[in-house]
Amino acid sequence: MIQEQVNSIIVLNKRKEVNDMMFIPGNIPSLKNSKVKTSRGIFSSPTVSKFLRSIGIQGFNSRKKTVKGYVDPTRPNQFEALRSVFMAMKYGKGDPLVIGYHQVRNSKRLFDFSNSVEIIQDLMTAHDFIEDDNVKHVFPVPMSKEGLLINPDDPRAFPLYSVDKENPGVWIKLF
């Protein structure tokens, strides 16, 4: 089932004729604002844990570059499945990578752009898609759903995020 979703995302990318973009499904939570403090330590919130489980990840550590997936073959790591797409997009581009993000949210709730891309960049680091998510290696920028950057003459020419209750996620493009 999950592999079918990944395949349909890749097909969707081809159908849109935007081979230089990829889509990560799910309403992307804020990692920074989703910490739960307990007597045993600080942990990710249930929202973050639910998102990670939905893409086949039990846990990860971006500093150690480790990702713990599920043994169950019906729950593959969907992020890892996008490695070849990401590496093809990255080919020939040097550091720092300028990574465009277009958030597709499941509601009109306000969100913080920088916090919402933090978990994606941490996952990219943990999966070793990028060396690190600091400014030496990565600059995150908002973009349109079609993969266009902001026009300095008309910065509000198009929406930099959208709402789709049925298909939330994030479009990613490397510039």
Question: PLM ranges: what are they?
Answer:
Residues M1-F175:
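Acidic, proline/glycine-enriched N-terminal capping motif
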